[in-house]
Structure formats: C-alpha cells, structure tokens
C-alpha cells in the first residue's frame, strides 16, 4: 500500500496545484471561483472530483497500511512505528487545515 500512498500523494499535490491556480480565497469571490473551475476550466470538474475523492482514497490506503503493520507486528519496531504515528498525525492535521478551515 506504500506505492498507492505515493501515487495518491502525487495526485493530490498535482490536482491541488491546478486547483490553486484558479481558486480565490476572498470571501466574496470564493464560490464564484469554484463555479469557474467547474464550468470554464478545461476538465476542471474532473480535477476537482479527483482531488476530493483522492483524499478519501489516500486515507483508506493509510488505514490499510496501518492495519497491515498491526497484523504483522510492526509496532515492535518502536522508532519506525513512532515515526509513522507522527506522520499520521501530520497528515490528519493537514487534512483538517485544508478541509475544515477554508
């Protein structure tokens, strides 16, 4: 699942960059910029859907990766497991900042 995580992360970064090129965060124009992305940008609706659904698939892959680590007893490798827990917390904080706060 590590390779799927890498693929999901690369897809999220690319689609996020493409969406950020057309998005404005001003309170009066934010909704119209999303409408602009979906209607006027070539395949903007597809980029937006890939970005939204890719985030869900990314977390599914993370949970499967953690489940595999639990099944095979990888938690016995303390340093590696703790780094993974820190990475999971960072990913969850980033998702909160990117989804809830805007």
From Swiss-Prot:
Compartments in which it is found: Mitochondrion inner membrane
Transmembrane segments: 1-21, 45-66, 81-101
Mitochondrion recorded as keyword: yes
UniProt cross-references to SUPFAM superfamilies, sorted A to Z: Transmembrane di-heme cytochromes (SSF81342)
Top-rank lineage group of the source organism: Eukaryota
Pfam families: Cytochrome_B
GO CC annotation: mitochondrial inner membrane
Membrane topology per record: Multi-pass membrane protein
Record: residues binding heme b b566: 65
Keyword RNA-binding attached: no
Cofactor(s), names only, from the UniProt record: heme b
Binding note for cofactor: Binds 2 heme b groups non-covalently.
GO terms classed as biological process: mitochondrial electron transport, ubiquinol to cytochrome c
Region forming the signal peptide: none
Binding annotation for heme b b562: 51
UniProt-recorded Gene Ontology molecular function terms: metal ion binding; ubiquinol-cytochrome-c reductase activity
Keyword vocabulary terms for this entry: Electron transport, Heme, Iron, Membrane, Metal-binding, Mitochondrion, Mitochondrion inner membrane, Respiratory chain, Transmembrane, Transmembrane helix, Transport, Ubiquinone
Function text: Component of the ubiquinol-cytochrome c reductase complex (complex III or cytochrome b-c1 complex) that is part of the mitochondrial respiratory chain. The b-c1 complex mediates electron transfer from ubiquinol to cytochrome c. Contributes to the generation of a proton gradient across the mitochondrial membrane that is then used for ATP synthesis.
Assembly: The cytochrome bc1 complex contains 3 respiratory subunits (MT-CYB, CYC1 and UQCRFS1), 2 core proteins (UQCRC1 and UQCRC2) and probably 6 low-molecular weight proteins.
Further facts: Heme 1 (or BL or b562) is low-potential and absorbs at about 562 nm, and heme 2 (or BH or b566) is high-potential and absorbs at about 566 nm.
Family, as annotated: Belongs to the cytochrome b family.
Protein name: Cytochrome b
Organism of this sequence: Megalops atlanticus (Tarpon)
């Amino acid at each position: 699942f590590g390779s799927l995580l890498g693929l999901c992360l690369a897809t999220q970064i690319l689609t996020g960059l493409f969406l950020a090129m057309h998005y404005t965060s001003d309170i009066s124009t934010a909704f119209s910029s999303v409408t602009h992305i979906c209607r006027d940008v070539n395949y903007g609706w597809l980029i937006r859907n890939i970005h939204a659904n890719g985030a869900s698939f990314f977390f599914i892959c993370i949970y499967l990766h953690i489940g595999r680590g639990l099944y095979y007893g990888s938690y016995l490798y303390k340093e590696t497991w703790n780094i993974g827990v820190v990475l999971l917390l960072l990913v969850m904080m980033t998702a909160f900042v990117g989804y809830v706060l805007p």
